[in-house]
Amino acid sequence: MVWAVSRPFLTPKPATDYCLGLAKSILDALPDPSETPARMIIRPKVRGFICVTAHPTGCAAHVQEWIDYVKAKGPIKPGPKKVLVIGASTGYGLASRITAAFGSGAATLGIFFERPSEEGRPATPGWYNTIAFTHAARAAGLYAKNIMGDAFTDEIKQQALNLIRSDMGQVDLVVYSLAAPRRTHPRTGVVHKSCLKPVGVPYTNKTVDTDKGIVSDVTIEPANEAEVADTVAVMGGEDWEMWMNALRDANLLAPGATSVAYSYIGPEVTWAIYKNGTIGLAKNDLERAARNIDAQLKSHGNGRAFISVNKALVTQASSAIPVVPLYISILYKLMKAKGTHEGCIEQMHRLFATQLYNGKTPTFDAGGRVRVDDWEMRPEIQAAVREVWPSVTTENLSEKTDIAGYRSDFLKLYGFGLAGVNYDAEVEPHRSKSHV
């Protein structure tokens, strides 16, 4: 999942000199070099489950690592040719875009919502990631354009339709990878706010403050009916259906087109807050939408749509979910010991190379989902998680888990901790048109 639409800690502001409106492409929205302030040293500043700073050079290095991984794995042929990624700036969405572009030479259009840099304040990591990807893709001779804005709105959808029609003709892959705290419904104008809560009864379990390294119990009160409905409205499948209907009605889906959205199921220890909680109910609605979209695409040139259930990873979204960071820290230690650990780019490359393309046929579970969480859910791994879980304390956290690996991956999301980057050097926080 990717925080591709407005976030609670990144509340969008009115248009500034640096952002000429949400409906502008990133190239038009980039700051004027003449307005560039002084260079600055950028350090990570962690506030709870987020980092409020991002390093442009580090983000670019992280993107390049992912590109290098895909290129080293060799071409994915046949693969997608023209791809729309909705939620393209971080996490699984960005990894999907990189895999399509550098694995299959695909033309890509990315939709995202990020905050550009301001006076004395770096941009969000997704802003820097997108610029780095766009620069690398164009240097490789690949088509890469971007639209910055709220993907839930009709205006952004229409702008995407216009750009696809004029530049791409049709798309043969649509990746839907949004995770958001709120959605203004385009028909009713109602603002729905999602929440991460159990349903029915309070939930108590262990969690970890990943910054301080403190393990403690947390109790989360259950959601009420309105909160459940709001979370489904934000994180469910309605917007995915709206995107696909708009593309279909505009005749912008190529015959045989594929669409995929991402989900997570996980082990029983996380079910109360995830699978059986508000977010899980929203994911159930995403699966409902997948079935509807699949039926429509099958009647439109034998296309297909489905959910890919992915591995638990450190992302901007997962770090906000109670209990999950402790589970991920345990999981990382166990899977690294087995040599089966994967990050976002490894997951998406395996999805594309073994399930979607490369002459392969998807393998579905009983629910019609592709499972690239299969290595995570191996019985021996989950048995080991269950054995370790009760014994983890603040005192033995570093011994029992890979909290160091969790922290490293967390900081990399924001461009920190990358090899070869001088974090003691002053850096230009803005990225102007000359950078792409």
Q: Would you name each region that the model predicts?
A:
Residues 37-64, 138, 269-436:
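NAD(P)H-dependent oxidoreductase Rossmann-fold/reductase module
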Residues 78-111:
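Canonical Rossmann dinucleotide-binding motif of NAD(H)/NADP(H)-dependent dehydrogenases/reductases
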Residues 159-188:
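A glycine-rich helix->loop->beta "capping" turn
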Residues 148-160:
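The beta1-alpha1 cofactor-binding region of Rossmann-like NAD(H)/NADP(H)-dependent oxidoreductases
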Residues 61-80:
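A short, basic/flexible loop-to-alpha-helix module at the beginning of a structural domain
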Residues 105-143:
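Glycine-rich phosphate-binding loop and adjoining beta1-alpha1-beta2 segment
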Residues 196-303, 309, 314-332:
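Catalytic loop of short-chain dehydrogenase/reductase
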